[in-house]
């Protein structure tokens, strides 16, 4: 079932622009991942990765980024969550890259500071075409439920590399691992929303002084 069947229609026509959607499938000997997304959505989400905590975080990206997102994944989680977690990041990154196309008219940069109780996380990103991750989350526990907290970094490495995004994630406070991670995903979502929005003063233009991204 396609995202158009499961998720809401776009709000993009406000500027009479094409709907920015993508559908990407990645199948390996370890995982089978499909991502459908609509950048101009309303935050509807279907996430079934076999990793409940990752599903919860994907819902944060969708809800706070106002992206309609459908992620379906089957992987070798009987061995470890690593392959599925990473491949979801890879596929989501590829879908973002596909949906953005030539990146004409986008704001390009995004920045947000998100609190969650005692946790405070700052994210800044740039759809620069130069993939990079600077990661500064320090969780006090190795696991949140059954989820290995090391996998948060692996997810964002995969996403940044495959979306060609420069991404900085910095923790300013926090003592609860769940709160720290969720604040990070919420800050990422709001930064993503900001960066991918269309700037009405630059419609049809590459947001770079070089004229290329």
Swiss-Prot record:
Source species, domain of life: Bacteria
GO biological processes: L-histidine biosynthetic process
Cellular-component GO terms for this entry: cytoplasm
InterPro entries, per the entry: IGPD_sf, ImidazoleglycerolP_deHydtase, ImidazoleglycerP_deHydtase_CS, Ribosomal_Su5_D2-typ_SF
Pathway(s) per entry: Amino-acid biosynthesis; L-histidine biosynthesis; L-histidine from 5-phospho-alpha-D-ribose 1-diphosphate: step 6/9
Catalyzed reaction equations: D-erythro-1-(imidazol-4-yl)glycerol 3-phosphate = 3-(imidazol-4-yl)-2-oxopropyl phosphate + H2O
CDD domains to which the protein is assigned, alphabetical: IGPD
GO molecular function: imidazoleglycerol-phosphate dehydratase activity
EC number assigned by the record: 4.2.1.19
Cellular localization per UniProt: Cytoplasm
Enzyme class label: lyase
Keyword line: Amino-acid biosynthesis, Cytoplasm, Histidine biosynthesis, Lyase
Primary site of residence: cytoplasm
UniProt similarity note: Belongs to the imidazoleglycerol-phosphate dehydratase family.
UniProt cross-references to PANTHER family, sorted A to Z: IMIDAZOLEGLYCEROL-PHOSPHATE DEHYDRATASE, IMIDAZOLEGLYCEROL-PHOSPHATE DEHYDRATASE HIS7
Protein name (record): Imidazoleglycerol-phosphate dehydratase
């Amino acid at each position: 079932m396609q995202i158009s069947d499961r998720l809401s229609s776009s709000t993009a026509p406000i500027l009479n622009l094409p709907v920015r959607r993508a559908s990407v499938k990645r199948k390996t000997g370890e995982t089978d991942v499909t991502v459908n997304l609509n950048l101009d959505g309303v935050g509807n989400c279907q996430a079934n990765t076999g990793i409940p905590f990752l599903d919860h975080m994907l819902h944060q990206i969708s809800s706070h980024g106002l992206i309609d997102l459908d992620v379906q994944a089957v992987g070798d989680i009987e061995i470890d969550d690593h392959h599925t977690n990473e491949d979801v990041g890879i596929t989501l990154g590829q879908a973002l890259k596909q949906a953005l196309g030539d990146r004409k008219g986008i704001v390009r940069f995004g920045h947000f500071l998100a609190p969650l109780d005692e946790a405070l996380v700052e994210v800044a990103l740039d759809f620069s075409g130069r993939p990079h991750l600077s990661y500064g989350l320090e969780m006090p526990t190795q696991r949140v439920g059954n989820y290995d907290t090391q996998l948060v970094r692996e997810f964002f490495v995969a996403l940044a590399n495959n979306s060609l995004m420069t991404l900085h994630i910095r923790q300013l406070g926090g003592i609860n691992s769940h709160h720290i991670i969720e604040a990070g995903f919420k800050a990422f979502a709001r930064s993503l929303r900001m960066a991918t929005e269309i700037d009405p003063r630059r419609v049809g233009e590459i947001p770079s002084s070089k004229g290329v991204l």
